Amino acid sequence: MRLLIFLGLLWSLVATLLGSKWPEPVFGRLVSPGFPEKYADHQDRSWTLTAPPGYRLRLYFTHFDLELSYRCEYDFVKLSSGTKVLATLCGQESTDTEQAPGNDTFYSLGPSLKVTFHSDYSNEKPFTGFEAFYAAEDVDECRVSLGDSVPCDHYCHNYLGGYYCSCRAGYVLHQNKHTCSALCSGQVFTGRSGYLSSPEYPQPYPKLSSCTYSIRLEDGFSVILDFVESFDVETHPEAQCPYDSLKIQTDKGEHGPFCGKTLPPRIETDSHKVTITFATDESGNHTGWKIHYTSTARPCPDPTAPPNGSISPVQAIYVLKDRFSVFCKTGFELLQGSVPLKSFTAVCQKDGSWDRPMPECSIIDCGPPDDLPNGHVDYITGPEVTTYKAVIQYSCEETFYTMSSNGKYVCEADGFWTSSKGEKLPPVCEPVCGLSTHTIGGRIVGGQPAKPGDFPWQVLLLGQTTAAAGALIHDNWVLTAAHAVYEKRMAASSLNIRMGILKRLSPHYTQAWPEEIFIHEGYTHGAGFDNDIALIKLKNKVTINGSIMPVCLPRKEAASLMRTDFTGTVAGWGLTQKGLLARNLMFVDIPIADHQKCTAVYEKLYPGVRVSANMLCAGLETGGKDSCRGDSGGALVFLDNETQRWFVGGIVSWGSINCGAADQYGVYTKVINYIPWIENIISNF
């Protein structure tokens, strides 16, 4: 199907080129008079054969028998096309001076062929004459012999009865239908330098072309033209460039025309606009020209880099539109006056001045370091020195605060004080936890008064009609029992928090106010004491000192320090053996009780009450040592022998109504089970 479509299109093209009607066939047979018998004397016959335009005639002989004579003077067949004789034939075979057709084929030079037969007055022998056949055939005008001129500049396309020409990209067929003229007008060059040349340079340039080249630079530049390599433009010895010519036009005047074989001299145009025209005629075979154009402008002063800086690029001369940038050494910053710059680039103007003044490279100044709460900063490099590579040392208030890093910071090139780990924020002085002057031995119910420094984490929680306790675990977080603050969870500000006291009613204390109370989501008020744990976030951080200090949270290894019969300490202002709230902070050292035994005791005392795995029991089978009402939320603490710090292992939760009774233990929330919950609340709030 595709082939049929193609053939249809081809037929349409040929029909368009030749007209709507295909030429009638031209062919036939020619014979001598009387053939195949002998021809008579005194015979003169001629045939004029004609083919359609674009065709030629082909003729060959199948029989040829004529009288042989010197130069075929007697009998002959003459073939001629136009004014040219193609051949004069006689005899049967060719000799040195005579030609017989043999197997040769003869072609007309155009669409016409004349065949002439002549016999003289006598023949010594009977000759039978000739038989010839002819036909018209298409002429391939695109096929040329060596030395003949080509019909087309670029591409020649033959068809039946004629041909047509086409051109390569960048050329257009001239109206003469043979010459390809270059499309070389409207070329614009805007670079400060470059090359331009005649089409096809260094090959011969095309004929009948008119080229225009425009150089357009910014005002302030001046174009310089240099002819390079070779110059070959058709000329005439008696006239100035009458055939092909090159002209150069500026707003200051015209240069040229140029032709011949001598390179024209340099042309300093003193203009930023140049137009070059190149015109060619239909003759000649010349290679053309090539121009290297450059530009110049009024130079700007050589820039000098500021101290501690450099410029780029470095050039021998800077002219219009040239630019340079300034870069400072590491530790220095660009300043224009007092204004910091992210970057700096200056551009040369047409009047020979830079568009911006040179900046400075000023040493980076990180400024005074941030104050360190509960600590201080020392200048190591020198008093108040805060510039690049200066060193400062942060330190925490000894004994009560510590930091995880070494506290050394350096002023870096980005303008920030930076630690050896790349930290930009100052260190944090974290409170030291678990320091106490307490030694094991004493009791609450059956206990004794605490001394200053024994339980610096102890917190007194006062409601309008209630009192409870808590333990400071950070400078703004208090750990307590959920049941002790449950009623205050929606009105945290009504809770009165006091620290740094031993006497419950002492007027000398540190006041703290809650910001928010967090009850464990697994705690259900009035339905047992599982998950009896809560956190109180303080509005402000408290200052850590000998009277106020957090207790540590248990390490992973702490479970081994809270086994049965291991001793812990609990302190509080709860009921004493006399049934009154203690005026002084009391404490007692009590052992951990066996969990199964404790569970069995409370199943017997209070059927349905469960001692869960989130609880631990403490006390003596014989009684006498226990926490009691008013101690709720206080910390049951243990000494970590490895760190020599006290940690909270339990929170006073619940127990028998009869505090300190035999076989009735105090029950505490097991803190180690809630470390992930505690850390999550503190880190997110």
Curated annotation (Swiss-Prot):
Q: Which GO terms describe its biological process?
A: complement activation, classical pathway; complement activation, lectin pathway; proteolysis
Q: What else is known?
A: Dimerization and MBL2 binding requires calcium ions.
The kind of enzyme this is, by top-level EC class, is: hydrolase
Which pairs of positions does the record mark as disulfide bonds? Answer: C72-C90, C142-C156, C152-C165, C167-C180, C184-C211, C241-C259, C300-C348, C328-C361, C366-C411, C396-C429, C433-C552, C598-C617, C628-C659
Q: Which UniProt keywords apply?
A: Autocatalytic cleavage, Calcium, Complement pathway, Disulfide bond, EGF-like domain, Glycoprotein, Hydrolase, Hydroxylation, Immunity, Innate immunity, Metal-binding, Protease, Repeat, Secreted, Serine protease, Signal, Sushi
Q: Which family does it belong to?
A: Belongs to the peptidase S1 family.
Q: Where in the cell is it found?
A: Secreted
SUPFAM superfamilies listed in its UniProt record: Complement control module/SCR domain (SSF57535), EGF/Laminin (SSF57196), Spermadhesin, CUB domain (SSF49854), Trypsin-like serine proteases (SSF50494)
| UniProt site (Cleavage) | R443, I444
Protein name, per record = Mannan-binding lectin serine protease 2
Native species of this protein?
Mus musculus (Mouse)
Name the job this protein performs.
Answer: Serum protease that plays an important role in the activation of the complement system via mannose-binding lectin. After activation by auto-catalytic cleavage it cleaves C2 and C4, leading to their activation and to the formation of C3 convertase.
Q: Which residues bind Ca(2+) 1?
A: E67, D75, D120, S122, N123
Describe the processing and modification events after translation: The iron and 2-oxoglutarate dependent 3-hydroxylation of aspartate and asparagine is (R) stereospecific within EGF domains.
Residues annotated as glycosylated are N103, N285, N308, N545, N641
Q: Which GO terms describe its molecular function?
A: calcium ion binding; calcium-dependent protein binding; complement component C4b binding; serine-type endopeptidase activity
Entry binding sites for Ca(2+) 2? D138, E141, N158, G162
InterPro entries in UniProt:
CUB_dom, EGF-like_Ca-bd_dom, EGF-like_dom, EGF_Ca-bd_CS, NOTCH1_EGF-like, Pept_S1A_C1r/C1S/mannan-bd, Peptidase_S1_PA, Peptidase_S1_PA_chymotrypsin
One Pfam match: CUB
Q: Which residues carry this modification: (3R)-3-hydroxyasparagine?
A: N158
EC number(s) per UniProt?
Answer: 3.4.21.104
Domain (Sushi) spans 298-363, 364-431
Keyword check for Isomerase: no
GO CC list: extracellular region
